[in-house]
């Protein structure tokens, strides 16, 4: 049993290393609410928060005001948000974007937990996020609230 547990940890570690700190963020190409495909790589040259969320996810919705604050504070300094929704209902997704005043890039394949992008990034729960540097490297993971502001303040001071 202990050996099995160690093996599972090794497998999880190997999987997560492809999206761990220092790794190049895998490309994402998903459609925004207008049906336009937007690539994550189109934001190269800026710091990007890749954020996984959903309209039905209460903890995600509670975190959105922190993202709005960070976006408003750092966007003109070179900070963007690329938010990937794991919604399955287009209406619920669009309603949440409007209600939470989310003005940055929103994309989804509306495939819920079956989204290939969620699998690519080993997303097991949301909210989940990755801070990506201007060169496409992951520099931090799961920064929320004050931790996100502190990291961005350090970067953009």
Question: What role is predicted for each listed range?
Answer:
Residues 62-100, 112-119:
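Structural microenvironment flanking redox-active thiols in thiol-disulfide oxidoreductases
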Residues 51, 82-85, 107:
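Short beta-strand segments
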Residues 44-45, 52-69:
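Conserved redox-active cysteine motifs that mediate thiol-disulfide chemistry
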Residues 26, 31, 94-135:
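Short, internal strand/loop/helix patches
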Residues 133-157:
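Thiol-/selenol-based redox modules, centered on thioredoxin-like
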Residues 1-31, 41, 46, 72, ...:
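N-proximal helix/coil linker or "cap" segments that precede and/or mark the start of modular domains
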Residues 38-39, 139:
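Generic structural signal for well-ordered beta-strand positions
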Residues 47-48, 127:
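Alpha/beta-hydrolase fold active-site loops
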């Amino acid at each position: 049993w202990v050996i099995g547990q160690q093996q599972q940890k090794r497998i999880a570690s190997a999987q997560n290393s492809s999206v761990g700190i220092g790794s190049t963020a895998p490309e994402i190409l998903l459609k925004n609410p207008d049906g336009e495909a937007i690539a994550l790589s189109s934001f190269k040259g800026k710091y990007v928060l890749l954020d996984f969320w959903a309209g039905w996810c209460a903890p995600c919705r509670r975190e959105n005001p922190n993202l709005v604050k960070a976006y408003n504070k750092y966007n003109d300094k070179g900070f963007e948000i690329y938010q990937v929704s794991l919604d399955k209902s287009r209406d619920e997704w669009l309603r949440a974007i409007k209600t939470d005043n989310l003005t940055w890039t929103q994309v989804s394949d509306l495939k819920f937990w079956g989204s290939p992008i969620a699998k690519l990034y080993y997303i097991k729960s949301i909210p989940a996020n990755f801070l990506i540097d201007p060169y496409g490297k992951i520099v931090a993971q799961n920064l929320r609230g004050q931790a996100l502001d502190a990291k961005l303040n350090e970067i953009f001071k």
